[in-house]
Amino acid sequence: CYSTVDVVGLGDNTFTFGGVAGTVGGSVTRCFATGNVQAWMTVGGVAGMVGTRGGSLTDCVALNGAVSGTESRSQRISRVGNVLKSEGGSESGNYAWSGMKVNGNTVADDDVEGSNGADLTYDDPNGLSRQFETIFGGNSAWTYAENGLPTLKNVGGTQSGDLPVWMTSQNKVYIYTAADLAQLAADVNGGNKMSGKTVLLMNDIDLSAYANWTPIG
């Protein structure tokens, strides 16, 4: 399975939101998500929570541009999915794009069994790191193309194999949330060089949670 849509939980007390599933109570294997995910709490690029009634998430890839909470006190925000081990939840063989923003910041990790998964990289000379091909290449359910998204076989409609624009546009900065904008302000006002980069505002931004906002630049 896969999902390319953005997922947003509106208002307070919005729990367990993920790019593919909110709560995983069964077995989810070999899926990917590319849309951005935002909710109040318990947010993951692929699944919000893994573990209800012994759920498992295996060989999945999060290619989301950003996952985030709706406010500064939001908790359990992860690249792949939050694991409820007390209920028998488990994760294994999972990866996430290394450039994904988690509450406005990138998170480096190499744990394929953890909530953030292990880093999967993309660069123009080398393309996608080999883990993506290992998961989807040669599988009977998928048609795999080098350095592109796999598409499901025997499924109607139109499917796109294009990678998310944020993975291939290294000179663009995408602003989806207030946290993204705050990070941009910190980078620019802190002296980090932004020469040659294009900043794109992707959503309306509410800065009411940020008191004494300092203008950018």
Where are these regions (language model features)?
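Predominantly extracellular beta-rich ligand-binding scaffolds that present long acidic/polar faces
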Residues: 1-217
